Curated annotation (Swiss-Prot):
Keyword Protein biosynthesis: no
Protein's name in the database: Growth arrest and DNA damage-inducible protein GADD45 alpha
Species of the source: Felis catus
Quaternary organization: Interacts with AURKA, PCNA, GADD45GIP1 and MAPK14.
Domain of life of the native organism: Eukaryota
Main function: Might affect PCNA interaction with some CDK (cell division protein kinase) complexes; stimulates DNA excision repair in vitro and inhibits entry of cells into S phase. In T-cells, functions as a regulator of p38 MAPKs by inhibiting p88 phosphorylation and activity.
Gene: GADD45A
Length: 165
């Protein structure tokens, strides 16, 4: 490995960490503004009704989910729809960390403590535009820029690893 290759790899890792941090910030704000949709079927419904309002789509799966044929078909359809409608899309490689981020907020709600139901489907997460000027967010801009640059390099669905805390 040459010095240039080592330096390039180090820069890529640092950039991915920054993108992961930006994604955490976007999800945190989306949760607080209630502009988030969780679940494959719920996401498909929203994409069917109001695709112009969706600013980011996250797909999350681990190794076990890679063998779920039905889930992979849903992912393929959602990816195709997002690409056709210019919706930024990312794949999250550690759904456990995504669950920590999203369930932290929902566990605090009174509805979460009423019944111990099945855990929510976190395989697909949509972030929508809140129709406010507050959404001029540098973290979201960073994610959109990352998605655009990835598409230029023919990586239509870039994979993000959320940093562990």
């Amino acid at each position: 490995m040459t010095l240039e290759e080592f330096s390039a790899g180090e820069q890529k890792t640092e950039r991915m960490d920054k993108v992961g941090d930006a994604l955490e910030e976007v999800l945190s704000k989306a949760l607080s503004q209630r502009t988030i949709t969780v679940g494959v079927y719920e996401a498909a419904k929203l994409l069917n009704v109001d695709p112009d309002n969706v600013v980011l789509c996250l797909l999350a799966a681990d190794e076990d989910d890679d063998r779920d044929v039905a889930l992979q078909i849903h992912f393929t359809l959602i990816q195709a729809f997002c690409c056709e409608n210019d919706i930024n899309i990312l794949r999250v490689s550690n759904p456990g960390r995504l669950a920590e981020l999203l369930l932290l907020e929902t566990d605090a709600s009174p509805a979460a403590s009423e019944g111990a139901e099945q855990p929510p489907d976190l395989h697909c997460v949509l972030v929508t535009n809140p129709h406010s000027s507050q959404w001029k967010d540098p973290a979201l801009s960073q994610l959109i820029c990352f998605c655009r640059e990835s598409r230029y390099m023919d990586q239509w669905v870039p994979v993000i690893n959320l940093p562990e805390r």
